């Protein structure tokens, strides 16, 4: 979660019911802050407000880190001076907070003149991954810097009339806690992908270069084990990918066997969830099964042809074959009666395109996404027929094809532990507009999702972001609990995960130039 504030000054802290609210007001354009969630074992346990204050010198800045609990109460503050820092990730374990930054003498810095920018770049760019270990009372326990090779350049800011140094890692910093042990961090620069682990004193345990090649990497910790999911895209054949699971045990420096994810029918996969099971605490991977000869374009024409052939869930106790259980559910073999062979949901006359997956407390895997409808462009076809003697007319009318598509209801599917697949429910969201059927669905399916859970009551909630509204859906009760407008007058509202069973509602008032954050129970 990230919200950039041009500047912050705390105006009010108020308590009402089960909600606490903080309001921040913009007061100085030279001060910037961002708020990030503190995560432990996948659960949000607090927040960090990272503020860049005034310059301390030509090369350094003053910084303030405010530590807040899950109810937005301040519990500690640290102030320090350093080069330009860009906060990436925050994790918590054993009363120690680990913050990971990109440190640079170039990236993120603003230069008044182009010649100053060129002079700095010619003098040499120094980039590093900077980790800081902080106690809850605001004391810095330890800190480390690892040199990073980042391709950098400049971008001219036409508003501030300055040149800003730009650059980013090839694979962004990922930081997780290791239960009872410390922290694991992964990042990839231009020359290497690296896993680094630390103990609770901030001492480095492992620094390991990941030699496996991939287009993307995802880090997850489970107990004392560290997992990395490697994705390799086909690039020239299908929009599915190949995946491998790497695993390490920092406690004794063990490297576990690599496990390749495959459905045994030669199909490609598309992972949409890599997380820990809420009951066992062990990793699972779930997603779509893509037909082996599917084209690279993820559009409704390919869906009609049968590009999506099912869904899968793979459970890991470790990456040893005996510790892995797989569940593949296909609709192209007739084993899922609610689906046609090409994935069309019979009762909805629409294709389900799953973009989120999660587990419940009964061992079921859920798949969520927009239903996609296809329709003939009868007006264009009629126009082409009428103007057929003119030759040019049909070309103009049929330039967009004879079919169109759009997103419709949100569909919730369930795969049981036995692999049975059903459509559990659907609910309405903002109405989408029609696009040419050959248009990739990513272009017009703007919905995004995440989940919030209540472990005590074993309830899962689904949060759906759409064009104009945010919908909160109770998965257990199969009903919409609340709909929140994203835009109302001068207010812009966003909703983020908070502590278990709660959400964080963030509102920006354009007129008052203020931001408020409140924790609300579901």
Model-based region annotation:
Residues 1-24, 522:
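Bacterial Sec-dependent N-terminal signal peptides
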Residues 20-86, 187, 241-243, 280, ...:
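Start-of-domain marker
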Residues 62-71, 115-139, 195-201, 240-254, ...:
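Beta-propeller blade signature
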Residues 82, 143-165, 259-268, 321-348, ...:
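Surface-exposed loop and turn segments in beta-propeller and other repeat-based domains
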Residues 219-232, 237-364, 369:
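Long, internal scaffold/assembly segments composed of regular secondary structure
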Residues 30-39, 80-92, 150-174, 212-223, ...:
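Repeated scaffold domains used in trafficking and secretory/extracellular systems
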């Amino acid at each position: 979660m990230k919200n950039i504030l041009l500047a912050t000054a705390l105006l009010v802290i108020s308590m009402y019911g089960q909600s606490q609210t903080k309001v921040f007001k913009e007061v100085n354009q030279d001060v910037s802050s961002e708020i990030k969630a503190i995560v432990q074992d996948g659960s949000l346990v607090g927040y960090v407000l990272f503020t860049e204050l005034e310059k301390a010198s030509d090369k350094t800045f003053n910084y303030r880190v405010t530590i807040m609990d899950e109810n937005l109460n301040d519990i500690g503050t640290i102030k320090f001076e350093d080069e330009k820092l860009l906060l990436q990730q925050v994790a918590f374990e054993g009363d120690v907070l680990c913050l990971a930054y990109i440190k640079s003498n170039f990236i993120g810095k603003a230069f008044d003149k182009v010649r100053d920018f060129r002079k700095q770049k010619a003098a040499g760019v120094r980039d590093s991954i900077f980790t800081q270990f902080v106690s809850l009372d605001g004391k810095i326990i330890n800190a480390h810097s690892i040199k990073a090779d980042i391709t950098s350049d400049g971008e001219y800011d036409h508003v501030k009339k300055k040149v800003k140094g730009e650059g980013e890692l090839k694979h962004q910093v990922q930081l997780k806690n290791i239960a009872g042990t410390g922290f694991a961090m992964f990042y990839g620069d231009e020359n290497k992908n690296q896993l680094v682990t630390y103990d609770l004193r901030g001492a480095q345990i492992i620094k390991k270069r990941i030699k496996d090649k991939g287009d993307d990497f995802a880090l997850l910790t489970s107990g004392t084990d560290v997992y990395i999911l490697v994705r390799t895209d086909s690039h020239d054949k299908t929009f599915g990918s190949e995946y491998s699971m790497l695993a390490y045990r920092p406690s004794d420096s063990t490297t576990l066997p690599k496990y390749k994810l495959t459905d045994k029918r030669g199909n490609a996969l598309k992972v949409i969830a890599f997380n820990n099971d809420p009951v066992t605490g062990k990793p699972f991977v779930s997603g779509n099964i893509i037909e082996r000869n599917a084209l690279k374009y993820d559009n409704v024409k390919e869906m009609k042809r049968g590009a999506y052939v099912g869904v899968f869930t793979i459970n890991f106790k470790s990456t040893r074959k005996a510790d892995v259980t797989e569940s593949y559910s296909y609709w192209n073999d007739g084993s899922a009666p609610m689906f046609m062979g090409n994935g069309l949901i019979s009762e909805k006359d629409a294709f389900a395109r799953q973009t989120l997956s999660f587990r419940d407390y009964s061992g079921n895997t859920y798949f969520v996404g927009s239903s996609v409808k296809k329709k003939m462009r009868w007006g264009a076809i009629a126009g082409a027929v009428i103007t057929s003697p003119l030759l040019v007319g049909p070309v103009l009318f049929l330039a967009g094809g004879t079919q169109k598509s759009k997103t419709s209801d949100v569909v919730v599917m369930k795969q049981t532990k036995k692999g049975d697949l059903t459509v559990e429910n659907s609910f309405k969201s903002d109405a989408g507009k029609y696009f040419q059927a050959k248009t990739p669905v990513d272009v017009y399916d703007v919905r995004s999702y995440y989940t919030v859970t209540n472990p005590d009551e074993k309830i899962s909630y689904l949060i759906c972001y759409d064009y104009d509204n945010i919908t909160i859906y109770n998965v257990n009760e199969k009903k919409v609990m609340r709909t929140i407008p994203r835009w109302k007058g001068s207010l812009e509202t966003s909703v983020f995960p908070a502590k278990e069973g709660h959400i964080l509602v963030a509102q920006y008032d354009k007129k008052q130039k203020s931001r408020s954050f409140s924790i609300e129970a579901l």
